[in-house]
Protein backbone atom coordinates (compact mmCIF):
# COMPACT_ATOMS: atom_id res chain seq x y z
CA UNK A 1 0.00 0.00 0.00
CA UNK A 2 1.46 3.37 -0.97
CA UNK A 3 1.63 6.25 1.49
CA UNK A 4 -0.96 8.15 -0.51
CA UNK A 5 -3.33 5.18 -0.65
CA UNK A 6 -2.82 4.41 3.04
CA UNK A 7 -3.47 7.90 4.40
CA UNK A 8 -6.60 8.02 6.54
CA UNK A 9 -8.53 11.27 6.56
CA UNK A 10 -10.27 12.16 9.78
CA UNK A 11 -14.04 12.09 10.02
CA UNK A 12 -15.58 15.02 11.89
CA UNK A 13 -17.63 13.70 14.80
CA UNK A 14 -19.02 14.87 18.13
CA UNK A 15 -18.41 18.52 17.34
CA UNK A 16 -20.56 20.80 19.49
CA UNK A 17 -19.91 24.54 19.40
CA UNK A 18 -19.19 26.52 22.57
CA UNK A 19 -22.22 28.66 21.69
CA UNK A 20 -24.48 25.61 21.79
CA UNK A 21 -23.19 24.61 25.23
CA UNK A 22 -23.52 28.22 26.46
CA UNK A 23 -27.11 28.25 25.18
CA UNK A 24 -27.87 25.06 27.11
CA UNK A 25 -26.59 26.68 30.30
CA UNK A 26 -28.64 29.82 29.61
CA UNK A 27 -31.75 27.72 29.04
CA UNK A 28 -31.29 26.07 32.44
CA UNK A 29 -30.69 29.46 34.08
CA UNK A 30 -33.73 30.97 32.34
CA UNK A 31 -35.88 28.13 33.67
CA UNK A 32 -34.73 28.90 37.21
CA UNK A 33 -35.36 32.63 36.70
CA UNK A 34 -38.88 31.93 35.40
CA UNK A 35 -39.68 29.88 38.49
CA UNK A 36 -38.45 32.69 40.73
CA UNK A 37 -40.53 35.28 38.84
CA UNK A 38 -43.56 33.08 39.37
CA UNK A 39 -42.70 32.98 43.09
CA UNK A 40 -42.12 29.25 42.85
CA UNK A 41 -39.37 27.32 44.61
CA UNK A 42 -36.66 27.13 41.90
CA UNK A 43 -35.31 23.69 41.02
CA UNK A 44 -32.07 22.39 39.56
CA UNK A 45 -32.27 18.84 38.20
CA UNK A 46 -29.28 16.61 37.50
CA UNK A 47 -28.51 12.91 37.30
CA UNK A 48 -27.86 10.82 40.38
CA UNK A 49 -24.29 9.60 40.53
CA UNK A 50 -22.92 6.50 42.19
CA UNK A 51 -22.82 2.77 41.66
CA UNK A 52 -26.56 2.37 42.20
CA UNK A 53 -27.28 4.39 39.04
CA UNK A 54 -24.62 2.83 36.79
CA UNK A 55 -25.89 0.40 34.17
CA UNK A 56 -24.11 -1.96 31.78
CA UNK A 57 -25.35 -1.50 28.23
CA UNK A 58 -24.47 -4.83 26.66
CA UNK A 59 -25.73 -3.79 23.22
CA UNK A 60 -23.56 -0.66 23.07
CA UNK A 61 -20.69 -2.29 24.93
CA UNK A 62 -20.11 0.36 27.57
CA UNK A 63 -21.20 1.58 30.99
CA UNK A 64 -23.89 4.21 31.18
CA UNK A 65 -25.80 6.19 33.74
CA UNK A 66 -29.31 5.12 34.68
CA UNK A 67 -32.39 7.34 34.77
CA UNK A 68 -32.38 8.26 38.46
CA UNK A 69 -32.41 12.03 39.00
CA UNK A 70 -31.88 14.34 41.95
CA UNK A 71 -33.68 17.64 42.37
CA UNK A 72 -32.08 20.49 44.28
CA UNK A 73 -34.43 23.24 45.50
CA UNK A 74 -33.40 26.67 46.74
CA UNK A 75 -35.90 26.89 49.62
CA UNK A 76 -34.74 23.59 51.10
CA UNK A 77 -32.23 24.60 53.76
CA UNK A 78 -30.21 21.45 53.03
CA UNK A 79 -29.97 22.40 49.34
CA UNK A 80 -29.65 26.19 49.48
CA UNK A 81 -25.84 26.36 49.68
CA UNK A 82 -25.34 23.92 46.79
CA UNK A 83 -27.99 25.74 44.79
CA UNK A 84 -26.04 28.98 45.22
CA UNK A 85 -22.78 27.25 44.27
CA UNK A 86 -24.40 25.70 41.20
CA UNK A 87 -25.68 29.08 40.03
CA UNK A 88 -22.20 30.58 40.39
CA UNK A 89 -20.53 27.82 38.39
CA UNK A 90 -23.21 28.00 35.69
CA UNK A 91 -22.62 31.73 35.29
CA UNK A 92 -18.83 31.42 35.26
CA UNK A 93 -18.65 28.54 32.75
CA UNK A 94 -21.02 30.39 30.42
CA UNK A 95 -18.71 33.40 30.70
CA UNK A 96 -15.71 31.21 29.76
CA UNK A 97 -17.56 29.88 26.73
CA UNK A 98 -18.67 33.31 25.52
CA UNK A 99 -15.18 34.79 25.88
CA UNK A 100 -13.28 31.77 24.55
CA UNK A 101 -11.48 31.27 27.86
CA UNK A 102 -10.54 28.02 29.56
CA UNK A 103 -9.77 27.33 33.21
CA UNK A 104 -8.59 24.45 35.33
CA UNK A 105 -11.03 23.07 37.89
CA UNK A 106 -8.66 24.49 40.52
CA UNK A 107 -8.78 27.95 38.94
CA UNK A 108 -12.58 28.15 38.81
CA UNK A 109 -12.66 27.19 42.49
CA UNK A 110 -10.33 30.06 43.39
CA UNK A 111 -12.04 32.50 41.04
CA UNK A 112 -15.41 31.92 42.73
CA UNK A 113 -14.24 31.59 46.32
CA UNK A 114 -14.99 34.61 48.50
CA UNK A 115 -16.83 35.59 51.65
CA UNK A 116 -20.46 36.53 51.05
CA UNK A 117 -21.06 40.21 51.85
CA UNK A 118 -22.24 40.96 55.41
CA UNK A 119 -21.73 37.33 56.46
CA UNK A 120 -18.95 35.04 57.60
CA UNK A 121 -20.00 32.48 54.99
CA UNK A 122 -17.62 31.49 52.19
CA UNK A 123 -18.98 30.55 48.79
CA UNK A 124 -16.72 27.48 48.78
CA UNK A 125 -14.70 26.00 51.62
CA UNK A 126 -12.67 23.71 49.38
CA UNK A 127 -12.35 22.29 45.89
CA UNK A 128 -14.12 19.19 47.15
CA UNK A 129 -17.26 21.36 47.08
CA UNK A 130 -16.83 22.83 43.59
CA UNK A 131 -15.76 19.66 41.76
CA UNK A 132 -19.05 17.76 42.34
CA UNK A 133 -21.03 20.83 41.25
CA UNK A 134 -19.14 20.83 37.95
CA UNK A 135 -20.11 17.18 37.45
CA UNK A 136 -23.74 18.04 38.25
CA UNK A 137 -23.65 20.74 35.57
CA UNK A 138 -22.13 18.35 33.02
CA UNK A 139 -25.05 15.99 33.52
CA UNK A 140 -27.66 18.73 33.62
CA UNK A 141 -26.71 20.21 30.24
CA UNK A 142 -25.74 16.85 28.72
CA UNK A 143 -22.09 17.50 27.99
CA UNK A 144 -18.60 16.73 29.26
CA UNK A 145 -16.44 18.97 31.42
CA UNK A 146 -14.06 19.72 28.59
CA UNK A 147 -16.87 21.30 26.55
CA UNK A 148 -17.55 23.63 29.50
CA UNK A 149 -14.01 24.96 28.86
CA UNK A 150 -12.79 23.36 32.08
CA UNK A 151 -9.82 21.06 32.45
CA UNK A 152 -7.74 19.17 35.00
CA UNK A 153 -4.08 18.13 35.08
CA UNK A 154 -2.99 16.56 31.76
CA UNK A 155 -1.34 13.15 31.56
CA UNK A 156 -0.36 10.90 28.67
CA UNK A 157 1.79 11.07 25.53
CA UNK A 158 1.13 10.60 21.81
CA UNK A 159 3.70 9.46 19.25
CA UNK A 160 3.48 8.28 15.66
CA UNK A 161 2.43 9.23 12.16
CA UNK A 162 -0.64 11.30 12.95
CA UNK A 163 -1.11 14.93 11.95
CA UNK A 164 -2.95 17.29 14.28
CA UNK A 165 -4.04 20.92 13.97
CA UNK A 166 -4.13 23.08 17.11
CA UNK A 167 -6.90 25.60 16.43
CA UNK A 168 -6.26 27.38 19.73
CA UNK A 169 -2.60 28.12 19.01
CA UNK A 170 -2.08 29.86 15.67
CA UNK A 171 -3.54 26.86 13.80
CA UNK A 172 -0.25 25.03 14.33
CA UNK A 173 -0.11 21.86 12.26
CA UNK A 174 2.24 19.09 13.35
CA UNK A 175 2.97 15.40 13.02
CA UNK A 176 3.45 13.52 16.30
CA UNK A 177 6.29 11.45 14.82
CA UNK A 178 8.36 14.59 14.24
CA UNK A 179 8.40 16.09 17.74
CA UNK A 180 11.38 14.14 19.03
CA UNK A 181 11.34 10.95 21.06
CA UNK A 182 9.18 12.57 23.74
CA UNK A 183 6.18 12.85 21.42
CA UNK A 184 3.25 15.17 22.10
CA UNK A 185 2.01 15.69 25.65
CA UNK A 186 -1.73 15.04 25.56
CA UNK A 187 -3.65 18.01 26.90
CA UNK A 188 -6.63 17.56 29.18
CA UNK A 189 -8.85 19.21 26.54
CA UNK A 190 -8.63 17.64 23.09
CA UNK A 191 -12.05 18.49 21.71
CA UNK A 192 -12.54 18.71 17.90
CA UNK A 193 -13.13 22.46 18.19
CA UNK A 194 -9.55 22.82 19.49
CA UNK A 195 -7.50 19.85 18.32
CA UNK A 196 -8.35 18.62 14.84
CA UNK A 197 -7.20 15.17 13.76
CA UNK A 198 -6.15 15.79 10.16
CA UNK A 199 -4.89 12.43 8.87
CA UNK A 200 -2.62 9.47 9.51
CA UNK A 201 -0.77 6.70 7.70
CA UNK A 202 -1.00 4.36 10.69
CA UNK A 203 -2.74 0.99 10.56
CA UNK A 204 -3.62 0.73 14.26
CA UNK A 205 -3.44 2.49 17.61
CA UNK A 206 -1.46 0.87 20.44
CA UNK A 207 -2.16 2.10 23.97
CA UNK A 208 0.55 1.34 26.57
CA UNK A 209 0.07 1.51 30.32
CA UNK A 210 3.64 2.38 31.28
CA UNK A 211 5.76 5.24 30.01
CA UNK A 212 8.81 2.95 30.21
CA UNK A 213 7.37 0.61 27.56
CA UNK A 214 6.17 3.61 25.54
CA UNK A 215 9.76 4.91 25.46
CA UNK A 216 11.19 1.45 24.75
CA UNK A 217 8.98 1.03 21.69
CA UNK A 218 10.00 4.44 20.35
CA UNK A 219 13.70 3.70 20.94
CA UNK A 220 13.36 0.43 19.02
CA UNK A 221 11.58 2.15 16.12
CA UNK A 222 8.41 0.13 16.64
CA UNK A 223 5.84 2.76 15.50
CA UNK A 224 7.52 3.31 12.12
CA UNK A 225 8.30 -0.36 11.50
CA UNK A 226 4.76 -1.44 12.34
CA UNK A 227 2.83 1.63 11.10
CA UNK A 228 1.13 2.35 14.39
CA UNK A 229 0.30 5.27 16.63
CA UNK A 230 1.40 5.00 20.26
CA UNK A 231 -0.35 6.48 23.28
CA UNK A 232 1.29 6.11 26.68
CA UNK A 233 -1.14 6.59 29.57
CA UNK A 234 1.29 6.47 32.49
CA UNK A 235 -1.06 4.29 34.55
CA UNK A 236 -4.80 4.78 34.58
CA UNK A 237 -5.68 6.86 31.54
CA UNK A 238 -6.60 10.48 32.28
CA UNK A 239 -9.73 12.00 30.76
CA UNK A 240 -7.80 13.74 27.99
CA UNK A 241 -6.01 10.54 27.00
CA UNK A 242 -9.25 8.54 27.03
CA UNK A 243 -10.96 11.18 24.92
CA UNK A 244 -8.11 11.19 22.39
CA UNK A 245 -8.05 7.38 22.20
CA UNK A 246 -11.79 7.46 21.50
CA UNK A 247 -11.40 10.14 18.83
CA UNK A 248 -8.44 8.50 17.04
CA UNK A 249 -10.28 5.17 16.97
CA UNK A 250 -13.51 6.63 15.62
CA UNK A 251 -12.32 9.46 13.40
CA UNK A 252 -9.53 7.51 11.72
CA UNK A 253 -11.34 4.17 11.89
CA UNK A 254 -8.27 2.53 13.42
CA UNK A 255 -8.20 -0.74 15.38
CA UNK A 256 -7.30 -0.03 19.01
CA UNK A 257 -5.06 -2.45 20.90
CA UNK A 258 -4.26 -2.08 24.60
CA UNK A 259 -1.06 -3.30 26.30
CA UNK A 260 -0.83 -3.25 30.11
CA UNK A 261 0.77 -5.12 32.99
CA UNK A 262 -0.67 -8.58 33.56
CA UNK A 263 -2.48 -7.91 36.80
CA UNK A 264 -5.95 -6.82 37.93
CA UNK A 265 -4.90 -3.16 37.99
CA UNK A 266 -3.65 -3.30 34.38
CA UNK A 267 -6.70 -5.24 33.24
CA UNK A 268 -8.95 -2.66 34.86
CA UNK A 269 -7.08 0.09 32.98
CA UNK A 270 -8.00 -1.79 29.80
CA UNK A 271 -11.64 -2.11 30.81
CA UNK A 272 -11.89 1.63 31.49
CA UNK A 273 -10.55 2.39 28.01
CA UNK A 274 -12.87 -0.18 26.44
CA UNK A 275 -16.11 0.09 28.45
CA UNK A 276 -15.74 3.28 30.49
CA UNK A 277 -15.63 3.78 34.24
CA UNK A 278 -18.29 3.91 36.93
CA UNK A 279 -17.18 7.42 37.93
CA UNK A 280 -17.66 8.74 34.37
CA UNK A 281 -20.43 6.39 33.25
CA UNK A 282 -22.44 9.33 31.91
CA UNK A 283 -19.67 10.08 29.40
CA UNK A 284 -18.78 6.61 28.11
CA UNK A 285 -20.26 7.49 24.72
CA UNK A 286 -17.47 10.06 24.28
CA UNK A 287 -14.62 8.23 26.00
CA UNK A 288 -14.95 4.47 25.55
CA UNK A 289 -13.79 2.19 22.73
CA UNK A 290 -15.99 -0.94 22.85
CA UNK A 291 -14.12 -2.46 19.89
CA UNK A 292 -10.73 -2.30 21.65
CA UNK A 293 -8.73 -5.52 21.98
CA UNK A 294 -6.27 -6.62 24.67
CA UNK A 295 -2.87 -7.95 23.61
CA UNK A 296 -1.21 -8.50 27.00
CA UNK A 297 0.28 -9.06 29.40
CA UNK A 298 -1.58 -12.25 30.34
CA UNK A 299 -0.98 -15.07 32.78
CA UNK A 300 -0.70 -17.36 29.74
CA UNK A 301 2.31 -15.30 28.60
CA UNK A 302 4.27 -16.52 31.63
CA UNK A 303 4.46 -20.09 30.34
CA UNK A 304 4.41 -19.19 26.63
CA UNK A 305 7.47 -16.93 26.90
CA UNK A 306 9.16 -18.75 29.81
CA UNK A 307 8.84 -15.85 32.24
CA UNK A 308 8.31 -17.93 35.40
CA UNK A 309 11.43 -16.49 37.04
CA UNK A 310 10.26 -12.87 36.70
CA UNK A 311 6.68 -13.02 37.98
CA UNK A 312 5.65 -11.22 41.16
CA UNK A 313 3.24 -12.21 43.89
CA UNK A 314 -0.21 -10.67 43.83
CA UNK A 315 -0.95 -8.33 46.72
CA UNK A 316 -4.07 -8.61 48.85
CA UNK A 317 -5.37 -5.61 46.92
CA UNK A 318 -4.75 -7.44 43.62
CA UNK A 319 -6.64 -10.49 44.86
CA UNK A 320 -9.57 -8.40 46.08
CA UNK A 321 -9.75 -6.50 42.78
CA UNK A 322 -9.60 -9.72 40.73
CA UNK A 323 -12.53 -11.19 42.65
CA UNK A 324 -14.54 -7.99 42.14
CA UNK A 325 -13.77 -7.99 38.42
CA UNK A 326 -14.95 -11.57 38.00
CA UNK A 327 -18.41 -10.39 39.07
CA UNK A 328 -18.58 -7.42 36.69
CA UNK A 329 -21.00 -8.05 33.78
CA UNK A 330 -18.45 -6.80 31.22
CA UNK A 331 -15.97 -9.49 32.30
CA UNK A 332 -18.53 -12.28 31.91
CA UNK A 333 -16.87 -14.07 29.02
CA UNK A 334 -14.89 -17.28 29.11
CA UNK A 335 -11.59 -15.66 28.11
CA UNK A 336 -11.51 -13.11 30.93
CA UNK A 337 -13.05 -15.44 33.50
CA UNK A 338 -10.28 -17.92 32.71
CA UNK A 339 -7.57 -15.25 32.92
CA UNK A 340 -8.79 -13.90 36.25
CA UNK A 341 -9.17 -17.39 37.70
CA UNK A 342 -5.63 -18.32 36.66
CA UNK A 343 -4.32 -15.19 38.36
CA UNK A 344 -6.19 -16.08 41.55
CA UNK A 345 -5.11 -19.72 41.46
CA UNK A 346 -1.44 -18.95 40.85
CA UNK A 347 -1.44 -15.66 42.79
CA UNK A 348 1.05 -14.14 40.35
CA UNK A 349 1.27 -11.02 38.24
CA UNK A 350 3.55 -10.21 35.31
CA UNK A 351 4.72 -6.73 34.33
CA UNK A 352 5.27 -5.44 30.79
CA UNK A 353 8.90 -4.75 31.54
CA UNK A 354 9.46 -8.38 32.56
CA UNK A 355 9.85 -9.05 28.83
CA UNK A 356 13.27 -7.39 29.16
CA UNK A 357 14.34 -10.67 30.78
CA UNK A 358 14.48 -12.08 27.24
CA UNK A 359 16.29 -8.98 25.95
CA UNK A 360 15.52 -5.28 25.80
CA UNK A 361 14.11 -5.25 22.28
CA UNK A 362 12.07 -8.46 22.66
CA UNK A 363 8.81 -6.58 23.25
CA UNK A 364 9.28 -4.66 19.98
CA UNK A 365 10.77 -7.34 17.76
CA UNK A 366 8.88 -10.45 18.87
CA UNK A 367 6.18 -10.16 21.52
CA UNK A 368 3.96 -7.42 20.09
CA UNK A 369 4.49 -8.04 16.35
CA UNK A 370 3.77 -11.77 16.70
CA UNK A 371 0.72 -11.45 18.93
CA UNK A 372 -0.78 -8.66 16.84
CA UNK A 373 -0.07 -10.43 13.53
CA UNK A 374 -1.72 -13.61 14.86
CA UNK A 375 -4.56 -11.60 16.45
CA UNK A 376 -3.82 -13.27 19.76
CA UNK A 377 -6.11 -10.94 21.72
CA UNK A 378 -8.49 -11.05 24.64
CA UNK A 379 -11.91 -9.43 24.03
Features from the language model and the residues they span:
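Nucleic-acid enzyme cleavage-core boundary/entry regions
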Residues: 1-255, 264-379
Amino acid sequence: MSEKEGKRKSKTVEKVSPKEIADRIKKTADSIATQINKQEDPEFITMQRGKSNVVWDEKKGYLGLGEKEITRTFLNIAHARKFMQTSMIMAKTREYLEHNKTASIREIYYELKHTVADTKENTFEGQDESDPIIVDLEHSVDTIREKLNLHANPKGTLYGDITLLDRMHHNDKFNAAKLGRGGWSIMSRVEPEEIEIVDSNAEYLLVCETEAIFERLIEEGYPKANKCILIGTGGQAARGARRLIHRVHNELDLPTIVFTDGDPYGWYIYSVIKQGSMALAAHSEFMSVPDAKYVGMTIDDVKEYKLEAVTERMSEGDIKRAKEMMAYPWFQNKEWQSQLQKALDQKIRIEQQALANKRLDFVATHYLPEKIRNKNFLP
